[in-house]
Amino acid sequence: MKTKLQYYLPKMLITKFFGWLAEKKAGIITYWIILFFIKIYKINLKEIKTKDIKSYNTFNDFFSRRIKIDCRRIDYDPSIIICPADGIITNFGYIENTEKLQLKNHNYTLKSLLAQNETMIDIFQHGIFFTTYLSPKNYHRIHMPCDGSLIKMIYVPGQLFSVNLKFYKNISNIFSKNERVICLFKTNFGYMIQILVGSIISGTISTSWYGKINYKRDGIIKLWKYNINSNNKPIFLKKGDEMGFFTLGSTVITLFSKKNILIKENLSNYKEVRVGDVLAYGIQNVK
């Protein structure tokens, strides 16, 4: 019943309202809302960089909080690929072809997930993927799994279905339907994509080099190029560098273009992970 209700809810209106509310500077009200949130979701205050709750002017300021550098261990061994976010690994595996990519118990096509971009479909049709779900309790900044140079970024408008673990199984192709930002990088392991998937109540999707991507929500696909022939400044990020963040829970899908990456042996579905945890081991200098 709750799943069917999502099809009829004014999801965009709800998201805009909560996004507006989360950006309001409401003084003591904001302070008490944050305290309530901390209690409900058992937020670990020991790892927060700014512990003074009163210093957060809005709820979003707290939600997108930074943590202390030493709270997440990054292994800088160049052959190691790390988890980009705190959350739960809901699925991972090898992409057999363009027609078979299973995410959260649903079969997707690369064509639908990558917004019909034929170039990227060709690159990733024999690749590897990891899906990380971020719940409201998690640290919500997204980091780089390995060193990479940004090639392009695509904003894909879409629905705002909840990606909560209680609902995703009953909504087919949810990641292809939902709003998302696709970031393509060139790495020493070949090409990599980080897909930041939106969700109901998720106010914004932001990247470290651009800021808020979906603030207009005008229903138009947008493309930014960052290669040497574009007008945009080249972007290079190191492993562990912040590359983006959500306001409220959502999902990150990480794709690699080659099958010369070995998934960590004891990695399992529905395993809790943190930024810096080892996902896989790779062979470098892929052409």
Swiss-Prot record:
<dbReference type="GO" id="GO:0005886">
    <property type="term" value="C:plasma membrane"/>
</dbReference>
<dbReference type="GO" id="GO:0004609">
    <property type="term" value="F:phosphatidylserine decarboxylase activity"/>
</dbReference>
<comment type="function">
    <text>Catalyzes the formation of phosphatidylethanolamine (PtdEtn) from phosphatidylserine (PtdSer).</text>
</comment>
<keyword id="KW-0210">Decarboxylase</keyword>
<feature type="active site" description="Charge relay system; for autoendoproteolytic cleavage activity">
    <location>
        <position position="250"/>
    </location>
</feature>
<keyword id="KW-0670">Pyruvate</keyword>
<keyword id="KW-0865">Zymogen</keyword>
<dbReference type="InterPro" id="IPR033177">
    <property type="entry name" value="PSD-B"/>
</dbReference>
<feature type="site" description="Cleavage (non-hydrolytic); by autocatalysis">
    <location>
        <begin position="249"/>
        <end position="250"/>
    </location>
</feature>
<keyword id="KW-0456">Lyase</keyword>
<dbReference type="GO" id="GO:0006646">
    <property type="term" value="P:phosphatidylethanolamine biosynthetic process"/>
</dbReference>
<dbReference type="InterPro" id="IPR033178">
    <property type="entry name" value="PSD_type1_pro"/>
</dbReference>
<feature type="active site" description="Charge relay system; for autoendoproteolytic cleavage activity">
    <location>
        <position position="86"/>
    </location>
</feature>
<feature type="active site" description="Schiff-base intermediate with substrate; via pyruvic acid; for decarboxylase activity">
    <location>
        <position position="250"/>
    </location>
</feature>
<keyword id="KW-1208">Phospholipid metabolism</keyword>
<protein>
    <recommendedName>
        <fullName>Phosphatidylserine decarboxylase proenzyme</fullName>
        <ecNumber>4.1.1.65</ecNumber>
    </recommendedName>
</protein>
<dbReference type="Pfam" id="PF02666">
    <property type="entry name" value="PS_Dcarbxylase"/>
</dbReference>
<keyword id="KW-1003">Cell membrane</keyword>
<comment type="pathway">
    <text>Phospholipid metabolism; phosphatidylethanolamine biosynthesis; phosphatidylethanolamine from CDP-diacylglycerol: step 2/2.</text>
</comment>
<comment type="subunit">
    <text>Heterodimer of a large membrane-associated beta subunit and a small pyruvoyl-containing alpha subunit.</text>
</comment>
<feature type="active site" description="Charge relay system; for autoendoproteolytic cleavage activity">
    <location>
        <position position="143"/>
    </location>
</feature>
<keyword id="KW-0472">Membrane</keyword>
<comment type="similarity">
    <text>Belongs to the phosphatidylserine decarboxylase family. PSD-B subfamily. Prokaryotic type I sub-subfamily.</text>
</comment>
<keyword id="KW-0444">Lipid biosynthesis</keyword>
<keyword id="KW-0594">Phospholipid biosynthesis</keyword>
<dbReference type="InterPro" id="IPR003817">
    <property type="entry name" value="PS_Dcarbxylase"/>
</dbReference>
<keyword id="KW-0443">Lipid metabolism</keyword>
<feature type="modified residue" description="Pyruvic acid (Ser); by autocatalysis">
    <location>
        <position position="250"/>
    </location>
</feature>
